[in-house]
Curated annotation (Swiss-Prot):
Belongs to the UPF0173 family. The keyword Cell membrane does not apply. The keyword Translocase does not apply. This is UPF0173 metal-dependent hydrolase NP_2132A. Keywords: Hydrolase. Gene3D superfamilies: Ribonuclease Z/Hydroxyacylglutathione hydrolase-like. The lineage of its organism: Archaea, Methanobacteriati, Methanobacteriota, Stenosarchaea group, Halobacteria. InterPro entries: Metallo-B-lactamas, RibonucZ/Hydroxyglut_hydro, UPF0173, UPF0173_UPF0282_UlaG_hydrolase. It comes from Natronomonas pharaonis (strain ATCC 35678 / DSM 2160 / CIP 103997 / JCM 8858 / NBRC 14720 / NCIMB 2260 / Gabara) (Halobacterium pharaonis). GO terms for molecular function: hydrolase activity. It comes from the Archaea.
């Protein structure tokens, strides 16, 4: 599994011959790329409807959309998407096969609206676990899994459900504070999840979410977690598994 971070919450995940793009937003200072610089992915995954997560979704409307039904409906009307998983999207707790990958939609603790003033509901906010095989009740160390937490606060569900059941190997966690978890809470999340690697995201894009990533690294080390902090530069890749 190949992971690439394009800044903010935008990630590209390659599983076998399948390419997935999560929360496309290239108007952030961590990337030098424009949407036109990328090949169209097979799937676009949207965690929620805020502008900094869907701003460039329309540039990849040839892909199959993975999002809540409410957000799928909006994206079909406004971003030009014509295809969604299951014909209408998915919802929390569901798992769908996406080419060579499996995608499980997880809970996120955040607000969710779209358009100016956020007056249009985009359904429940979400995170995603992208894995090489379908999640099973029994532990499966051979199933490589990447967790994108979306925009969220620290949740007990990370410790009780996502960690023990979905077993993420790599966790991408919002750490910019103000709108989401800060570095300390993100470090606790990494510990609860039992991930091997944890990367901060959703930071340094706007003044309210500027942080020193050393705070995340230090906080993670202080938890005694087994997770290794991975602080990527924009457009940098990481091979998992």
């Amino acid at each position: 599994m190949e992971l690439t971070w394009y800044g903010h919450s935008t990630w590209h995940v390659s599983v076998g011959s399948t390419d997935l793009l999560i929360d496309p937003f290239f108007g952030n200072p961590k990337t030098d790329l424009e949407p036109s610089d990328l090949d169209s992915p097979d799937y676009v995954l949207l965690t929620h409807g805020h502008e900094d997560h869907v701003a460039h979704a329309g540039a990849f409307s040839d892909a199959t959309l993975v999002a809540t039904p409410e957000l799928v409906g909006y994206a079909e009307d406004n971003f030009g998407f014509e295809d969604a998983v299951g014909g209408m999207g998915m919802n929390l707790g569901g798992s769908v096969e996406c080419g060579d990958a499996w995608v499980t939609m997880t809970r996120a603790d955040h607000s969710n609206g779209i358009e100016t003033g956020y007056e249009t509901s985009a359904g429940m906010p979400a995170g995603f676990v992208v894995s090489e095989s379908e999640p099973q009740r029994a532990s499966d160390a051979a199933n490589t899994a990447f967790y994108h937490a979306g925009d969220t606060s620290l949740m007990v569900e990370m410790r009780e459900v996502i960690g023990p059941y979905l077993e993420p190997d790599f966790a991408a966690l919002p750490a910019g504070d103000h709108f989401t978890m800060g570095p300390e809470q993100a470090a606790i999340a990494a510990d609860w999840l039992g991930a091997d690697y944890a990367a901060p995201m959703h930071y340094d894009t706007f003044p309210p979410i500027e942080i020193d990533t050393d705070e995340f690294v230090d906080a993670l080390n202080a938890t005694g977690a087994d997770a290794e902090a991975v602080v990527l530069d924009g457009d940098e890749s990481f091979t998992l598994g």
